[in-house]
Regions:
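N-terminal beta1-alpha1-beta2 submodule of the flavodoxin-like/Rossmannoid cofactor-binding fold
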Residues: 1-76, 83-85, 90, 94, ...
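Redox-cofactor binding/interface segments in oxidoreductases and associated redox assembly factors
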Residues: 76-77, 105
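Short, conserved loop/helix-junction motifs that constitute active-site signature segments
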Residues: 68, 94-100, 123-128
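P-loop/Walker A phosphate-binding loop and immediately adjacent motor/lid segment at beta-alpha junctions
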Residues: 48, 101-102
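Short, glycine-/small-residue-rich phosphate/pyrophosphate-handling segment
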Residues: 104-146
Length: 162
């Protein structure tokens, strides 16, 4: 089964995990980027997203230069913003047909997973969303709180899926 890693990363933590998975699995990887980049000021982004959360605002993302139909398994990486998948990932899930695909999500956060995985399942009702992994970092840091062994076990599990 052909695997693709799809992720969005603001602080670099989700990117770090996505690339760790890519190194081990040697599969394709796709970084989601917004058309209008987020501010480099973390507090500004947090405030903006808190204000737009109630409206379910979804940012426009850059065109994907990949044929998703060629992949059976999507390894989906998202930071958790306001207890749910970040807006760019929600845009990706809303705009792309992932029916029949297996989605293995991982979420990076500082300990506030919230409804992230349930929302991914809701956005992909005709996909098989399973084997979710919550990866926790220290607040405002790239220091992992989740044991590295747990992450390696997660990657090993994905590798065994055929």
């Amino acid at each position: 089964m052909k695997k693709l890693i799809v992720y969005f990363s603001y602080t670099g933590n989700t990117s770090m995990i996505a690339n760790k998975i890519k190194e081990k699995l040697d599969c394709d990887i796709l970084e989601i980027e917004t058309v209008v980049p987020y501010s480099k000021d973390y507090d500004s982004v947090v405030n903006d997203e808190q204000n737009s959360e109630a409206s379910n605002h979804l940012p426009e993302i850059k065109k994907l230069n990949i044929d998703l139909s060629k992949y059976d398994i999507i390894i989906l990486g998202t930071p958790v913003w306001w207890y749910r998948p970040c807006p760019a990932i929600r845009t990706f899930l809303t705009e792309n047909n992932l029916d029949g695909k297996t989605i293995i999500p991982f979420a990076t956060n500082a300990g506030w997973l919230g409804r992230t995985f349930n929302e991914i399942k809701k956005l992909c009702p005709n996909s098989n969303v399973k084997n979710e992994m919550n990866i926790v970092f220290e607040s405002y840091s790239d220091k992992l709180k989740t044991d590295e062994k747990e992450i390696n076990n997660f990657i090993d599990m994905i590798e065994k899926i055929n």
